[in-house]
A protein has these predicted regions:
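C-terminal motif of bacterial Sec signal peptides marking the signal peptidase cleavage site
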Residues: 15-19
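Bacterial signal peptide processing site
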Residues: 21-24
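Extracytoplasmic small-molecule ligand-binding "clamshell" domains
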Residues: 59-129
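Periplasmic-binding protein-like
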Residues: 70, 147-155, 224, 228-265, ...
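Short helix-initiation/N-cap motifs at beta->coil->alpha
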Residues: 89, 104-116, 159, 195-210
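Extended ligand-binding regions for polar small-molecule ligands
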Residues: 89-98, 158-161, 171, 176-179, ...
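Acidic, polar ligand-binding/catalytic clefts
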Residues: 93, 102-166, 234-235, 240-241
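A ligand-binding cleft/hinge motif common to bilobed small-molecule-binding domains
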Residues: 129-137, 185-186, 209, 214-243
Length: 285
């Protein structure tokens, strides 16, 4: 603003002289005006360039806040050394490396992760979240799918339950606000069972093994991994699986769309270069 005012002042003064001074003064006026305008344009360009540089620096310094579940093996869990590991954890790391963004991941639990994203305390979550139309309609925005999984039922190893018919009058366990909960809820009236809700899978599994509930519903690869690796004392009941759905990275705030776009681009790259298959094989064989 000060530069423009100066240009106007110089121009007005010179024009006043030209009225009395003839053609030489007119030439001087034109030269002065052109030079001042050039200075103003250069200053504006410098300011714009500085703003772009500042914005770029801010973007490069940004650390995205990502949340995940606490115990959803093999997708996220804490190993014997206390380190957070799993398919989700490694996929996110590979994508961030491919796309060149920084992030911090916090293992806070399924319910807490949902709440953190909805409250704006986290930018996104990766926690084996199935992509559904219902979740999309409630405000969630998903990446492309990165893993297909279905849900099924498991019982204690010594149980004689062989299907849904054996659940009548009994209680089954599910994880709150999960696809497995939706699956069980869709069957409970038909087969006459009650539902008990848990915050995490390990606690739910212990309820089955301990006899507090007759069965549990959970994502099939999660139960299979836990049964195989921890001698859990459960078995998956054949013929109880539903149709598979894709897991996706999720955000709740549309202003974070950049994060989803980077996830999608990176996912495509790590599938193409073999890194994705390497990660999955590490945990599922």
């Amino acid at each position: 603003m000060k530069k423009s005012a100066l240009v106007m002042a110089v121009t007005m003064a010179v024009l006043g002289l030209s009225a009395c001074g003839g053609s030489d003064t007119t030439a001087t006026t034109a030269a002065a005006t052109t030079a001042a305008a050039a200075d103003t344009t250069a200053a504006a360009d410098t300011t714009a360039a500085a703003a772009e540089t500042t914005a770029a620096a801010a973007d490069s310094d940004k650390v995205w806040q990502i949340v995940t579940d606490t115990a959803f093996k093999p997708f996220e869990y804490t190993d014997d050394s206390g380190k957070l590991v799993g398919i989700d954890v490694d996929i996110l790391a590979a994508i961030a490396d491919d796309q060149g963004f920084k992030y911090e991941i916090k293992s806070i639990g399924w319910d807490a992760s949902i709440a953190a994203c909805q409250a704006g305390q986290a930018d996104g979550m990766i926690a084996g979240a199935s992509i559904t139309d219902e979740r999309k309609s409630s405000g969630w925005i998903f990446s492309d799918g990165y893993y297909d999984a279905n849900q099924s039922m498991a019982v204690a190893e010594n149980s004689d339950i062989t299907g849904f018919d054996g659940l009548k009058g009994k209680s089954v366990a599910v994880k709150t606000a999960s696809m497995s909960a939706d699956y069980a809820e869709s069957l409970k009236d038909q087969y006459g069972f009650e539902i008990t809700y848990f915050e995490d899978s390990p606690t739910m599994y212990q309820a089955v093994v301990g006899g507090q509930v007759a069965a549990c519903f959970d994502d099939t690869p999660i139960m299979a991994s836990n049964i195989k690796d921890t001698d859990l004392g459960m078995k998956i009941v054949d013929g109880t699986g539903n149709d598979p759905a894709e897991y996706g990275f999720a955000i709740f705030d549309s202003s974070k769309q950049e994060l989803v776009d980077m996830f999608n681009a990176g996912l495509k790259d790590i599938k193409a270069n073999g890194k994705y298959d390497e990660i999955v094989a590490t945990y599922l064989g």
